[in-house]
């Protein structure tokens, strides 16, 4: 694996990420959510993609793609491992979202190219990274209250907002993916909350991928 070449690709791609608001439709009619995971000891990569109406946040479509994993796990290069499955799920959607939430990092990455940014560039869609763990940068400790907020900083640059979305839950790291500003990324996530730790787009993507009760009930209603 030529990590020097991959690192150079990341730096080049990161220079093309748009950190300003460039939504084609604002407000969006549809917001998507995406989640990626691995099965069979990492040999299979799956990606779940959901489509929600906005502002109702009603689930209207979902797709799950499973493909052979194309590269091993290497810290800092996860987007190269994840985007092929995301692309396979994306291509199956009959209606593409106007804005996509990705479970993972956006520019809050050592080379400013997490999976939300990488995939946003690939398909040229506005994306937001909604990550559960810090990858780089520093932030001031948050209070335990829901709504506590702190900027994630690295070398004098704000990479994300660290936001405690729910009491007694770890915070989320909300960042520009592509064509969405840092402040707007936070605002969109906040608009898509319904009392859970995760915003509805990525919560539904996780529910679809994991076969959670909420998704099972939704399937029963559709029959």
UniProtKB/Swiss-Prot annotation:
Known catalytic reactions: Endonucleolytic cleavage at apurinic or apyrimidinic sites to products with a 5'-phosphate
Entry EC no(s): 3.1.21.7
GO biological process: DNA repair
Cofactor section: Mg(2+)
This protein's UniProt keywords: Cytoplasm, DNA damage, DNA repair, Endonuclease, Hydrolase, Magnesium, Metal-binding, Nuclease
First-level EC class: hydrolase
Coiled-coil annotated spans: none
One matching Pfam family: Endonuclease_5
Residues the record marks as site: Interaction with target DNA: 73
GO cellular-component term (any): cytoplasm
UniProt xrefs under InterPro entries: Endonuclease-V (IPR007581)
Localization per Swiss-Prot or TrEMBL: Cytoplasm
Binding site for Mg(2+): 35, 103
MF-aspect GO terms: deoxyribonuclease V activity; magnesium ion binding; RNA endonuclease activity, producing 5'-phosphomonoesters; single-stranded RNA binding
Predominant subcellular localization, coarse grouping: cytoplasm
Family of the protein in this entry: Belongs to the endonuclease V family.
Function, in words: DNA repair enzyme involved in the repair of deaminated bases. Selectively cleaves double-stranded DNA at the second phosphodiester bond 3' to a deoxyinosine leaving behind the intact lesion on the nicked DNA.
UniProt-recorded name of the protein: Endonuclease V
Native organism: Salmonella paratyphi A (strain AKU_12601)
Gene: nfi
């Amino acid at each position: 694996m030529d990590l020097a070449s991959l690192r150079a690709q990341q730096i080049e791609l990161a220079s093309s990420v748009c950190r300003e608001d460039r939504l084609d439709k604002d407000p969006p009619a549809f917001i998507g959510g995406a989640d990626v995971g691995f099965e069979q000891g990492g040999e299979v990569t799956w990606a779940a993609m959901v489509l929600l109406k906005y502002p109702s946040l009603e689930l209207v479509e979902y797709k799950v793609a499973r493909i052979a994993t194309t590269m091993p796990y290497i810290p800092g290069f996860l987007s190269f491992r994840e985007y092929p499955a995301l692309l396979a799920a994306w291509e199956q959607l009959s209606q593409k979202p106007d804005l996509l939430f990705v479970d993972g990092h956006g520019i809050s990455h050592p080379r400013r190219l997490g999976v939300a940014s990488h995939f946003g560039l690939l398909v040229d869609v506005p994306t937001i990274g909604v990550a559960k763990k810090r990858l780089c940068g520093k932030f001031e400790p948050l209070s335990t209250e829901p709504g506590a907020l702190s900027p994630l900083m690295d070398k004098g640059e704000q990479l994300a907002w660290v936001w405690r979305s729910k009491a007694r839950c770890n915070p989320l790291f909300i960042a520009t993916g592509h064509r969405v500003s840092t402040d707007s990324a936070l605002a969109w996530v906040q608009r898509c909350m319904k009392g859970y730790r995760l915003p509805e787009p990525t919560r539904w993507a996780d529910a679809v991928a994991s076969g959670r009760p909420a998704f099972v009930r939704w399937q029963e209603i559709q029959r």
